[in-house]
């Protein structure tokens, strides 16, 4: 059976699975730190690389390999390297492909911890990073130097759901001799396939939609075998490895990914449309709305707007924007107050004081993250119950 001839929904259920001699129908969980050899000669061959096979779960593990193969099939990638977290996926990508003195151009509209990694950690190791507008291609072009190795973007971005032209940005990167890295966390392969649009590398925080129920931490880097070889080399040495148990959970999550993402997107579009009509809302950010600045571009790259909706709360007289945002968040009874996203449960957070709290005020302003901004990762509850939980917005005029 040639598995890749099937539709993506079928691949999410069937791709990557390997059966043991016991004939299990669900992927096996290999909770092993190491693997036995038949002889000293075989051990030497495995360690020397002349014979394929498992050695130690920091290097490879059968359950992790099945997860990697399934996600690679869904993203159309030659190879996937699974990591312990989404942040370690970014770190492994950069450390595998860049050296001291190299230059990275990154969107300023990215996750706050990603900004910290680029600005505070990698800079100490001699990497230069320039932050530019996600949507201004001229800024990307102007930022290129003779040492530029990577372009890094989130599209849609966190939390303002800005969208970049992946094909156009890939063209600029390739002409500069650089690789385009796309964090596809918000969309997943169920909604967007960056490699097909010209990107070279995909980053995932598997913690989010791939898990789908807020249980485990994990990440992934995907791309060609040539690009993934040094990324895997860093992982094997540094040990930022995905655990077998977490990989097993993510395998189960991938089986329902397409069904869940459809439901998340339907709920998110309905909620965003409703929010635009509420007097307590000053502005809504959702790429599935025709009012979104990059709506046409988003719909040409994505099959839907995804599950993340952000909006600015309109403050009442005598109330600061942050006070207005916090009042709304504290008034919710159903939606969970937490910074995670991609869960079946809807979550709500105030980016300026949570996900982007360690970013400088100047950087937040440049990224458009204002004090009245609220982000909701729309879950799988009934839409009427979500609207009811946000009913405070109907009386905030």
Predicted regions and their residues:
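Conserved PLP-enzyme active-site core in the AAT-like
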Residues: 2-3, 12-21, 79-279, 285
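N-terminal "arm"/small-domain region of PLP-dependent enzymes with the aminotransferase-like
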Residues: 2-61, 69
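Glycine-rich beta-alpha junction loops
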Residues: 17, 31-37, 186, 208, ...
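Conserved N-terminal alpha-helix of the aminotransferase class I/II PLP-enzyme fold
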Residues: 39-88, 113-120
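Short, solvent-exposed beta-strand edge segments and adjacent coil->beta transition regions
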Residues: 51, 216, 304-308, 371-375
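PLP-dependent enzyme catalytic core of the Aspartate aminotransferase-like
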Residues: 119-120, 128, 142, 315-319, ...
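Short, well-ordered beta-strand elements within core beta-sheets of diverse protein domains
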Residues: 250-259, 307-318, 375-379
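Conserved small-domain helix->loop->beta segment predominantly found in fold-type I
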Residues: 269-345, 360-365
């Amino acid at each position: 059976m040639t598995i890749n001839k099937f539709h993506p929904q079928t691949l999410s259920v069937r791709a990557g699975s390997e059966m043991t001699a016991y004939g299990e129908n669900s992927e096996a969980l290999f909770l092993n730190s190491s693997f036995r050899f038949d002889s000293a000669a075989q051990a030497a061959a495995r360690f020397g690389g002349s014979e394929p096979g498992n050695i130690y779960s920091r290097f490879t593990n059968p359950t992790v390999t099945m997860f990697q193969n399934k996600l690679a099939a869904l993203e159309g990638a030659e190879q996937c390297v699974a990591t312990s977290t989404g942040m370690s996926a970014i770190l492994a990508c950069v450390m595998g492909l860049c050296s001291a003195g190299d230059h990275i151009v990154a969107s300023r509209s990215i996750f706050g911890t990603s900004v910290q990694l680029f600005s505070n950690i990698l800079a100490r190791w001699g990497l230069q990073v320039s932050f530019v507008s996600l949507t201004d291609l001229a800024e990307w072009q102007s930022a290129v130097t003779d040492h530029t190795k990577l372009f890094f973007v989130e599209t849609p971005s966190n939390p303002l759901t800005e969208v970049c032209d992946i094909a156009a940005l890939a063209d600029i990167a390739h002409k500069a001799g650089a690789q385009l890295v796309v964090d596809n966390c918000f969309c997943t392969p169920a909604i967007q396939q960056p490699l097909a649009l010209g990107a070279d590398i995909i980053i995932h925080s598997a913690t989010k939609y791939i898990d789908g129920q807020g249980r485990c931490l994990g990440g992934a880097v995907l791309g060609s075998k040539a690009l993934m070889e040094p990324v895997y080399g860093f992982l094997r040495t540094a040990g930022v490895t995905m655990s077998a148990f977490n990989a097993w959970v993510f395998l189960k999550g991938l089986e329902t990914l397409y069904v869940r993402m459809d439901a998340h997107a339907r709920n998110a579009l309905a909620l965003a449309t409703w929010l635009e009509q509420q007097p307590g809302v000053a502005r809504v950010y959702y790429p599935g709305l025709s009012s979104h600045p990059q709506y046409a571009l988003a719909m040409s790259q994505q099959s839907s707007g995804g599950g993340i909706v952000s909006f600015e709360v309109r403050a009442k007289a005598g109330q600061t924007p942050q006070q207005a945002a916090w009042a709304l968040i504290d008034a919710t009874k159903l939606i969970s107050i937490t910074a995670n996203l991609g869960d079946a449960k809807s979550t709500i957070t105030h980016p300026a004081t949570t996900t982007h709290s360690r970013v400088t005020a100047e950087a937040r302003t440049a990224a458009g993250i204002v004090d009245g901004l609220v982000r909701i990762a729309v879950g799988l509850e009934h839409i009427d119950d979500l609207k009811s939980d946000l009913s405070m917005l109907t009386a905030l005029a």
